[in-house]
């Protein structure tokens, strides 16, 4: 059984989250449900496949973390400008939600998907499941050979909830925040803390994970849509894509663009 989770605040729900959930319900199989971890918003959706959580009630550690650490510096402000790589506040909601779901889900496979995504075709479930072999505890979108963004793209993550080390991972991941260790890292963005926790579990337990982009990666511009995910889903990363309502054809690598342009969504 597969389960999905996402997170958003009130403005995010109105700008892109509602569309994400509506297109999820339209295209994903009927036996796949989605858990919404909501920050100060109620969606009003009445559908048995949609389970809504107040993130502050469901993830009790988040309040203390925010009360202790929510300041300009920890929001990534450097020299008067925000640098997302050092933002330990905005992205912490994703982390606490993922750790809660890992520990409380009864599914076999858990997918974290960013709320600024759109599903435009039926997901190939069997092919998706092949991205996460039984002996791997997580699968992710890597950015190998990217010196500017030397960490995973965490708009999509898969978790094998039947793996013996998956709860070791959630413990390490959440511990980075509850202990303040996140502030000792080179970067505080969740992409880097995910990589840190993943590598810790790999090194400590000999566990395996899968970079779905392969050893050479899938470019620096927009690896999400260049994976198999781009055949049924779009990730509206950044203000420009959100304003346009979709990603750009130029986001595709040349060898992938031709196939994508056969789909109505990308034309």
Language model features with spans:
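Residues that flank catalytic or metal-binding motifs in active/ligand-binding sites
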Residues: 94, 113, 152-155, 190
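A structural signal for well-ordered alpha-helical segments within the folded catalytic domains
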Residues: 15-18, 92-96, 188-196
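Catalytic core and acceptor-binding pocket of nucleotide-sugar-dependent glycosyltransferases
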Residues: 161-266
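Extracytoplasmic beta-rich repeat domains
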Residues: 86-88
């Amino acid at each position: 059984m597969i389960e999905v989770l996402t997170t958003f605040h009130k403005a995010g729900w109105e700008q892109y989250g509602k569309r994400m959930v509506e297109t999820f319900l339209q295209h994903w199989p009927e036996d796949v449900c989605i858990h919404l971890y909501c920050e100060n918003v109620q969606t009003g959706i009445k559908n048995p496949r949609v389970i809504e959580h107040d993130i502050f009630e469901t993830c009790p550690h988040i309040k203390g973390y925010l009360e202790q650490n929510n300041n300009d510096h920890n929001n990534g402000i450097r020299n008067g400008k925000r640098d997302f790589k050092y933002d330990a506040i905005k992205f912490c909601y994703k982390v606490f939600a993922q750790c809660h779901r890992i520990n409380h889900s009864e599914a076999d496979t858990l997918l974290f998907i960013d709320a600024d995504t759109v599903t435009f075709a039926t997901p190939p479930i069997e092919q998706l499941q092949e991205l996460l072999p039984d002996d791997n505890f997580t699968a992710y979108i890597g950015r190998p050979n990217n010196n500017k963004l030397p960490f995973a793209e965490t708009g999509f993550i898969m978790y094998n909830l039947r793996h013996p080390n998956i709860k070791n991972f959630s413990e390490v991941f959440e511990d980075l925040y509850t202990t303040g260790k996140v502030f000792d890292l080179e970067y505080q963005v969740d992409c880097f803390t995910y990589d840190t926790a993943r590598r810790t579990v790999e090194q400590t337990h000999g566990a395996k994970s899968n970079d779905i982009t392969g050893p050479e990666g899938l470019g620096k511009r927009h690896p999400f849509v260049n994976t198999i995910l781009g055949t049924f889903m779009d990730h509206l990363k950044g203000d420009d894509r959100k304003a346009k309502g979709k990603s750009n054809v130029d986001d595709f690598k040349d060898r992938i663009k031709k196939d994508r342009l056969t789909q109505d969504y990308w034309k």
